[in-house]
């Protein structure tokens, strides 16, 4: 059965706290989806963000973002007093997230809530900590050490802590016990609010699509705690890093800088790290979008010393063997493959063998720089795909029309029969809604008729990304 949904980051929801949260605005958004006949709410990754604020570079593949914890909901359960958070200036612009301001002020408020949490609900919190110990022990110590060392990445910590020597680790845990309890308590609060929201979504018939980045940030508890799973030397420095080769959009390619997986080691231990990660994500989400699917067929490896991505080479990924292992653990759970970018016949074959739906982005259909644009035109869509006007990495529909080349826009207007009476953004959404694609997802900004001011992210740029927020009303 064909179905539709909306891509809306939680951070972009309106709220008085400088950023969207898991509270009232999220519940009201679920009401909107249900009342408008939608089936899916697609999110961006919801992990704790660091420098650059990208949800695709979180400090942990497991932890939730503390910024998303709703403060009013904490007050309702007696963990905060209104005067402890309501008089604080949380933002300077209601249409943008000020991450620097949140970093300065939010943790001071959460500290009060966590202190009360441990005092009043110790047994429940300890039970949570025991259940989540696989990742929570490392994450809470990682964040405590990071705070102690002034936010510096773990590769700049003392050698004995970088290498996780037993005696130094034990000493750090003892000396930082109060900080560790804080970070554990924050995760308890996040998970509690998330589970309530997820239950409400289920009751309203809304399925949540989560987003799992293929790579993890070097400065993360994942890499610090599981360095053997990555391509690193004896001093724990990456030997090769991730990125994309040069193409029509970037002459130098893209140098992402994430450490690459040691697929040989992962295959030898049955992909345990990955299988645990995916199983965990299905506790959060009904559907998983796996970012950079082509990297499982072949990945682009760039020497860590390289200045641009031009020096990289293609290396074989784990292929179908990996996805067969995933299926054995999670069963036939719904997975969306992000199959955009440079694709080869072997990538297409891997997608076919998995049976996962791929992605079709309408804005790519009219780009004169890409000879493969026709595959993104709706009359060429297979049924087993997810159709988008644009994703978080694209401009909004109206933004694309105002910034794309005149030739591309003219082609789109002719092909889609766009006009000002219907609204060109609505015409582009109509195209994917009326296509043969089984799933159609539109960005909230396109429903609101926003131009480039509503763009979430511009790849290969620093600053100004991940900040867009919807205004109340």
Residue ranges of model-derived segments:
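Conserved, well-ordered alpha-helix/loop/beta-strand core segments that scaffold catalytic motifs
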Residues: 183-215
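Alpha-amylase-like alpha-glycosidases and glucanotransferases acting on alpha-linked glucans and related
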Residues: 9, 53-191, 216-441, 445-447, ...
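Surface-exposed amphipathic alpha-helices with a cationic face
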Residues: 34, 194-204, 327, 351-352
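Catalytic domains of carbohydrate-active enzymes, especially glycoside hydrolases
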Residues: 24-49, 280-285, 432-434
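Outer-envelope exported proteins of Gram-negative bacteria
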Residues: 44, 207-209, 213, 287, ...
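N-terminal regions that are enriched for targeting/export leaders
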Residues: 1-11, 27
């Amino acid at each position: 059965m064909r179905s539709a949904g909306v891509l809306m980051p939680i951070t972009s929801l309106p709220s008085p706290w400088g950023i969207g949260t898991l509270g009232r605005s999220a519940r009201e958004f679920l009401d909107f989806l249900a009342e408008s006949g939608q089936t899916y709410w697609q999110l961006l990754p919801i992990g704790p963000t660091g420098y650059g604020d990208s949800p695709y570079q979180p400090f942990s593949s497991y932890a939730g973002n503390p910024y998303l914890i709703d403060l009013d909901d904490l007050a309702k359960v007696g963990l905060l007093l209104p005067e402890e958070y309501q008089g604080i200036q949380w933002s300077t612009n209601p249409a943008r997230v000020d991450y620097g301001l949140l970093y300065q002020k939010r943790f001071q408020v959460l500290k009060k809530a966590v202190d009360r949490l441990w005092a009043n609900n110790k047994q429940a919190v300890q039970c949570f900590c025991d259940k989540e110990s696989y990742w929570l022990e490392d994450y809470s110590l990682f964040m405590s050490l990071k705070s102690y060392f002034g936010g510096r990445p773990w590769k700049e910590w003392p050698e004995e802590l970088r290498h996780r020597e037993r005696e130094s680790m034990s000493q750090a845990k003892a000396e930082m016990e109060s900080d560790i309890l804080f970070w554990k308590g924050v995760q308890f609060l996040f998970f509690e609010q998330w589970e309530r929201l997820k239950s409400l979504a289920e009751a309203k018939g809304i399925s949540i699509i989560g987003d799992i980045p293929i790579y993890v940030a070097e400065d993360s508890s994942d890499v610090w705690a599981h360095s053997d799973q990555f391509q690193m030397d004896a001093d724990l420095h990456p030997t090769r890093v991730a990125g994309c080769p040069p193409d029509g959009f970037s002459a130098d390619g893209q140098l992402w800088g994430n450490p690459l997986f040691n697929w040989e080691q992962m295959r030898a231990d049955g992909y345990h790290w990955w299988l645990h990660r995916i199983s965990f994500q299905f506790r959060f989400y009904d559907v998983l979008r796996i970012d950079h699917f082509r990297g499982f067929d072949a990945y682009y490896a760039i020497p860590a010393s390289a200045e641009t991505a031009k020096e990289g080479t293609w290396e074989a990924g784990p292929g179908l063997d990996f996805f067969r292992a995933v299926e054995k653990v999670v069963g036939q759970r719904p997975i969306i493959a992000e199959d955009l970018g440079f694709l080869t016949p072997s990538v297409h074959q891997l997608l076919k063998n998995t049976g996962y739906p791929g992605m079709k982005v309408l804005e790519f259909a009219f780009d004169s720089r890409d000879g493969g644009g026709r595959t993104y035109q709706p009359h060429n869509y297979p049924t087993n795909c997810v159709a988008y006007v644009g994703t978080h990495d694209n401009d909004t529909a109206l933004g694309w029309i105002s910034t794309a080349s005149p030739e591309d826009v003219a082609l789109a207007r002719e092909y889609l029969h766009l006009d000002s009476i219907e609204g060109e953004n609505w015409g582009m959404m109509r195209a994917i809604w009326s296509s043969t694609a089984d799933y159609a997802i539109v960005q909230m900004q396109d429903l609101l008729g926003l131009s480039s001011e509503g763009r979430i992210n511009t790849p290969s740029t620093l600053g100004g990304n991940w900040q867009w927020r919807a205004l109340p009303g």
